[in-house]
Amino acid sequence: SCNSVNSGTIHVACAGRIAYADSFWGSPARPAWTECQAGDDGANDQHGHGTHVAGSVLGDGSNSEEGYDGTGSAPGAQLYMQGVACWHYHPSNGWAYYMFTPNDYQNDIFQPAYDAGARVHTNSWGSNPTAGLPHNEYNLDSLVIDQSAYAMDDLLILYAMGNDGEDANLNGEIDLALLNPQATAKNILSIGASENFRCDMYSVTWSVLGY
C-alpha cells in the first residue's frame, strides 16, 4: 500500500481524492521470476492505463485539451485504487507488465474496497477465455464475481467487456459473444466502448476496428 498517494506525483485531475492505493499481485503461486513477489510498488503507474481509467472515473477536467472537456463520470468521488498488473523483468521477454488475476475475488479485491466505503467497483481489466473455449464463456471467475455481488448487494461491480470486439460484416454493430469471462457475470454491469465514427477525434490505441 502507499500512504502518500496524494503527493505531487499524482495527476492534477485526481489530486487530493485518492483514498488508498494498493498493488495486488494475485495468486501466491505466481512464477518465480516475478519481481513483485516481495510486495507493493505503491501508486506508481509506468504503463498509464490506471491513470487513464482513474481520470475517466473521477478526473475533474484539469489539464484538458483546449476545446475538450476531460471531466470524468464522478468528479467529486474518492478513489480506492487496486492495481492487478506488475511491472517486472521476464528472462525471455524483458521488462513488461504482467497481470495476475485474483485468487479470491471477494476477499482480495471486493471486500477490502467495500470495507473502505466503496459502493462502485470498476474493473478495466479481464482475462482470456479458458484455452480451447470461445469468448463469452461463463467460468469460475464469473461465478465468484456473481457470488461477491450477491454477498455485497449494495456494491455495483463493473467490468470491461474486453478489447476483442469485431464487426465482421461492417454493419456498424459489434458482433455478439466476444466478452471476456469476467464480463459474463450476471449480477454486474458490463461496459463496452461504442462504435460511433468520429473522424475528427483520435482513435483509442486499443481499437481493433481502426477508428
Spans of model-derived segments:
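Active-site glycine-centered loops adjacent to acidic/histidine catalytic or metal-binding residues
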Residues: 145, 162
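Glycine/threonine-rich flexible loop motifs
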Residues: 130-139, 171
